[in-house]
């Protein structure tokens, strides 16, 4: 996130993979979840498990960007020492009126609002880019160990620090220029 653009919001359209800057409206401790105001007609649902292991880094970066403090990516990129506990409680991480960067994972239906995740991923043709991660993984459908190592080595040489990558099956036998262009 190097720029923050605010666009007029269409309250009737909310699609999977859309990214929103949302505000915590209510914490539901019994569900270990939060309801978020994204500017839509219905509040979004964010479960604790959907925060992702590196939520704290994402939160700090977003808050620094909003508050116009230093937003240099390299100041937050490599410190992944303290991932969120898998069995934690949402009220220990979020509170009312917190700002959260989220991505829609399930569209709203009937009376329910959209389901969202705080672990953002940006899908391309050959790669899926995951900010605030340092993990590179290769599709399990690529069985050739030599090709897996080649792809991992290529991606490590081109991926920016502070980003993780999932290498998709269609990346098999692709040249570095194709992968770099997709990135």
Residue ranges of predicted features:
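Single-stranded RNA-binding surfaces
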Residues: 1-183
């Amino acid at each position: 996130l190097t720029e923050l653009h605010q666009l007029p919001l269409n309250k009737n359209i909310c699609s999977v993979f859309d990214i929103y800057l949302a505000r915590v409206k209510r914490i539901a401790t019994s569900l270990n979840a939060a309801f978020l105001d994204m500017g839509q007609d219905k509040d979004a649902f964010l479960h604790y498990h959907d925060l992702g292991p590196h939520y704290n880094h994402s939160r700090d970066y977003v808050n620094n960007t909003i508050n116009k403090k230093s937003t240099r990516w390299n100041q937050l990129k490599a410190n992944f020492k303290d991932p969120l506990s898998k069995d934690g409680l949402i009220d220990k991480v979020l509170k009312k009126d917190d700002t959260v960067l989220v991505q829609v994972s399930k569209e709203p239906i009937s009376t329910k609002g959209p389901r969202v995740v705080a672990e953002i991923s940006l899908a391309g043709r050959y790669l899926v880019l995951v900010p605030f991660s340092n993990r590179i993984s290769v599709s399990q459908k690529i069985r050739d160990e030599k090709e897996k190592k080649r792809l991992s080595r290529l991606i490590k040489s081109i991926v920016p620090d502070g980003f993780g990558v999932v290498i998709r099956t269609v990346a098999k036998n692709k040249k570095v220029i194709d992968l770099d262009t997709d990135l």
